[in-house]
Each structure stands twice: as structure tokens, then as C-alpha cells.
Amino acid sequence: MKSELNSIQMFGIKTPIIRAGDDVVQILEAELKEACIEPLEGDIFVLAESAVATSENRVVELERITPGERALALGEEYELDPREMELVIRECDEIFGGVPRAALTITKGILAPNAGIDASNAPEGHVVLLPEDPRKSAETIRKRLEERYSCRLGVIIGDSRTQPLRLGCTGPVSYTHLTLPTTDV
């Protein structure tokens, strides 16, 4: 099948720091207006999962977490803060093992170290969990953007990831919600 795609253009939208309870769609709308960008049919928004999760109040203060026996043992084994290990246990579907500083987990259908918990994009002493239901988050954001701009759009929630047995980071798509026709070529 011949592709109609001639080019891809990407625009970075600078936003203020997303805080717990912020409305990501309202922020996007304001920043798009400021940048004089009007989304068109078929445009796809790529959002960092840490920003979406933060807006959904998925930021946890570690001091409020009391680790259980399993978290204490696994935290020692994997050299992780036992409070963070407690959150890993609560958030993940399965722990496969680990190495120093990383427990290998399946969380919300993704292979992710430490259940995708992110300390790098959180205030000191806090961590950001993955969105509660990332697919629903992507769908909700997409529907609101489509309603606002009266065209079919896509939303991808992704973030940087480290991968087992690989050096460096990748930027995989974690969750999508598209109403656009796609062709696998």
C-alpha cells in the first residue's frame, strides 16, 4: 500500500513544571495558543508519563511509606531504599529479580526497572509512580483535545527507560490512544 506520508514535523511545546493536580490539557491548550500552534487532523501529542502521573497526584512522599518485611529484604538485596522497594512491591504485577539499584518488574504491562517509579522528576524525598491507568489517561486526554480542536488526534504517553542488559536510555512508547487509521508497513 502506498503511503500518503510525505514528511513528519515535530514541535516541542514548552510547559511550566507540571504539579500535582494540574490539568495537563488546559496547560497544553494555553501553551499551544502562546506558540500560535493549532493542532490539525492526524496530529499526535507525545506526553511524558511523569508529567501525566504528577498531574494525577501520583507523587508520593517517601517519609510516609512504612516498608514491610519483604521490602526490607528485597531493598537490601537490590540496594534500594526499603520505602521505594515497598512502593515497587505495591505497584508492580511481578518482580523477576534484579541487580544493584534496580528490581526488574512487569508493571502495567511494561518491563520496567523499579515498577517505573521515577525519583529524577520528583521533589526531594518524593517519587513519581506511573499513571494509575495509563491507557485511560491517554484516552481521556485525547478525547478532550479532540473536543477542543474538532479533529482526530492521537496521544502517546512515553518516557525514557533503561533496559535490562543495555547501556543508556531509550524513549519507548508506553501507552497510546489513537483514533487515527494506521498502517503497519
Language-model segments: residues:
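Single conserved hydrophobic/aromatic residue that forms the stacking wall/gate
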Residues: H177-V185
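N-terminal and secondary-structure boundary signal
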Residues: M1-L178
